Amino acid sequence: MKDENSINFLSSNESYLYDKSENELRPKVFEDFKGQVNVKETLSIFIRASKERGEALDHVFLSGPPGLGKTTLASIIAFEMNASIKITSAPAFDKPKDIIGILTGLDEKSILFIDEIHRLRPIIEEMLCIAMEDYELDWVIGQGANARTVRMPLPKFTLIGATTKPGKVTSPLYARFGITARFELYSEIELVEIIKRNSIILNIEIEEDAAFLLARSSRGTPRIANRLLRRIRDIAQVTGSLVVTSDIVSIGLEMLRIDGEGLDEQDRNILRSLILKFNGGPVGVDTLAISVGETADSLEDFYEPYLIMKGFINRTHRGRKATEFAYLHLNLEMKEEDISENQRVSF
């Protein structure tokens, strides 16, 4: 086995997965990983059982909105299993030889983390399914009458697949995962714990009220909380403040155009477009996305989960619809027929 707990990034394209500037804030063990309690408890049991049997951990499927810690958790799993980990994403696999090179280079009980696993090409996915189940690879050498199939044995490895779109993962691939976990948006209390922990790492003194205000504006997402914490640190430094207060956080949020509900300018653009251009809806996600200059994927993956969680948008079988809360938040008057329709949808 190679160096235990080593992290290997398979291409420079993975920088978005594991930003070095964020590395110092990433928890390394379960104890420091805040939130996702059920996910942690379940994985801890399976990891302990695998270690006691001396076996590789079963394949793990992680799903949920971006920025919630799926990549971080994969690294923690590797640490807890005393295993090396290779981190990559599905678009990095262009040809069969790409996946063959990676799989044959794995160590016994090591971990391969593939982000955006729903984007695997069909031929790559087929090869990966065989590797996950049989720990073998069939590789065709030559062409025509001279073609022959070579079977290559693989070490017992663990694949951790992550996606923001579990519905786009094919049934054959999903069935190969023995452990599945869904990440949910974090509560304010959980984000406050993360902010307090990371403020210590960044050598920032932050008041309790300030931490809560920052958490409330982080869209239930640790990645956003960390980014905002860094920007608030900049403001405190420039203003000569030794302590981050709620006033400093308020100044920073105003500069970043983030309101008291954690909505940024694009969130408000989405709600305005839904209300003013489409009379509050319902409207299809593709049409709504075009109206605000976004892709349907970015609207569904990044913006909608938080807007739905906060009660600004309802997702119906006819499309997206603004709630009464959205009208109130933007100080827009709701028509009588829209009030009746919203009450009917809510009921």
Swiss-Prot record:
Residues engaged in binding ATP: L25, R26, G67, K70, T71, T72, E133, D134, Y135, R176, Y186, R223
Entry keyword annotation includes Chaperone: no
Domain of life: Bacteria
Gene label: ruvB
Organism annotation: Borrelia garinii subsp. bavariensis (strain ATCC BAA-2496 / DSM 23469 / PBi) (Borreliella bavariensis)
Record field: catalytic activity: ATP + H2O = ADP + phosphate + H(+)
Annotated PANTHER family: HOLLIDAY JUNCTION BRANCH MIGRATION COMPLEX SUBUNIT RUVB, PTHR42848
Region spans: Small ATPAse domain (RuvB-S): 187-257
GO cellular component: cytoplasm; Holliday junction resolvase complex
Listed SUPFAM superfamilies: P-loop containing nucleoside triphosphate hydrolases, Winged helix' DNA-binding domain
Class of enzymatic activity (EC top level): hydrolase
Residues noted as binding DNA in the record, renumbered to the chain: R315, R320
Keywords, alphabetical: ATP-binding, Cytoplasm, DNA damage, DNA recombination, DNA repair, DNA-binding, Hydrolase, Nucleotide-binding
Region listing for Large ATPase domain (RuvB-L), in residue ranges: 1-186
Subunit structure comment from the entry: Homohexamer. Forms an RuvA(8)-RuvB(12)-Holliday junction (HJ) complex. HJ DNA is sandwiched between 2 RuvA tetramers; dsDNA enters through RuvA and exits via RuvB. An RuvB hexamer assembles on each DNA strand where it exits the tetramer. Each RuvB hexamer is contacted by two RuvA subunits (via domain III) on 2 adjacent RuvB subunits; this complex drives branch migration. In the full resolvosome a probable DNA-RuvA(4)-RuvB(12)-RuvC(2) complex forms which resolves the HJ.
A GO molecular-function descriptor: ATP binding
HAMAP family (UniProt xref): DNA_HJ_migration_RuvB
Name the UniProt record assigns to this protein: Holliday junction branch migration complex subunit RuvB
Subcellular localization, as worded in the UniProt entry: Cytoplasm
Chain intervals for the UniProt region annotation (Head domain (RuvB-H)): 260-347
UniProt entry tagged with the keyword DNA repair: yes
UniProt record, GO biological process: DNA recombination; DNA repair
